[in-house]
């Protein structure tokens, strides 16, 4: 069976992601605002060109659009940057969760993955609590939704490895970003955060396209 997520789109995504990662150490706003979302735009174009059903296509595009909005918001220098960024990515995760639940098939064996993920996220959240201030509630809500997204990714009935790997990369990216943003503030960490983020978005998009082109 041929899947309609095209190789040219994948290569353009890879090229633009590498360009951004390589340039990240020496570019600043507004260049970051322009370059950062381009790989996600490539994924949106790729999804538009697929043969997915209208409902699956709309949900996946919405997940990517809100991710793109979050990418842009987090590069803009204004006071509500973090709050709006969290809101955008929270909505993106909700659309991903909806897609996962539409193809839900409970697998008891995958429950063994939940405990280490839960402990890891719990430890990260506990570590950050003293540093969050007014963002405590939004960040904790976001963490809960992120964890639900990861857990539900493990229960899709097909393409489970690709989709769950994408969800785990998203978790790693978000936790690294949060720890660095609120505690460590090391500039070099941005490259790792964006690398894992781009890998996550590609795996989630590619996996979901394959899943729903197989009939969900």
UniProtKB/Swiss-Prot annotation:
Disulfide bonds: none annotated. It is found in: Cell inner membrane. It is an enzyme of class 3 (hydrolase). Its main location: membrane. Optimum pH is 6.5-7.0. GO terms for molecular function: hydrolase activity. It is a multi-pass membrane protein. It catalyses: a 1-O-(1Z-alkenyl)-sn-glycero-3-phosphocholine + H2O = a 2,3-saturated aldehyde + sn-glycerol 3-phosphocholine; a 1-O-(1Z-alkenyl)-sn-glycero-3-phosphoethanolamine + H2O = a 2,3-saturated aldehyde + sn-glycero-3-phosphoethanolamine. Competitively inhibited by lysophosphatidic acid. The chain crosses the membrane at residues 9-29, 32-52, 58-78, 84-104, 109-129, 131-151, 163-183, 189-209. The keyword DNA repair does not apply. It holds the Pfam family YhhN. Specifically hydrolyzes the vinyl ether bond of lysoplasmenylcholine (pLPC) and lysoplasmenylethanolamine (pLPE) to release a fatty aldehyde and glycerophospho-choline or glycerophospho-ethanolamine. Has no activity on diradyl plasmalogen, 1-alkenyl-glycerol, and monoacylglycerophospho-ethanolamine or monoacylglycerophospho-choline. May serve to protect the bacterium from lysis by lysoplasmalogen derived from plasmalogens of the host. PANTHER family: GH04784P. Belongs to the TMEM86 family. This is Lysoplasmalogenase.
């Amino acid at each position: 069976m041929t899947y309609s997520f095209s190789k040219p789109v994948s290569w353009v995504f890879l090229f633009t992601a590498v360009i951004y990662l390589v340039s990240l150490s020496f570019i600043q706003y507004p260049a970051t605002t322009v370059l950062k979302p381009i790989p996600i735009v490539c994924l949106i174009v790729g999804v538009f060109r697929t043969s997915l059903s209208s409902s699956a296509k709309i949900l996946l595009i919405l997940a990517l659009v809100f991710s793109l909005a979050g990418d842009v918001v987090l590069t803009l220098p204004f006071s509500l940057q973090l709050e709006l960024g969290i809101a955008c990515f929270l909505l993106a995760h909700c659309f991903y969760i909806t897609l996962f639940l539409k193809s839900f098939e409970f697998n008891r064996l995958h429950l063994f993955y939940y405990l280490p993920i839960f402990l890891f996220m719990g430890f990260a959240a506990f570590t950050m609590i003293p540093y969050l201030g007014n963002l405590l509630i939004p960040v904790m809500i976001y963490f809960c939704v992120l964890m639900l997204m990861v857990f539900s990714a493990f229960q899709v009935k097909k393409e489970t490895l690709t989709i769950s790997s994408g969800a785990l990369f998203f978790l790693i990216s978000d936790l690294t970003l949060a720890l660095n943003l609120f505690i460590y503030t090391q500039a070099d960490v941005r490259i790792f955060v964006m690398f894992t983020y781009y890998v996550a978005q590609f795996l989630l998009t590619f996996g979901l396209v394959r899943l729903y082109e197989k009939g969900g």
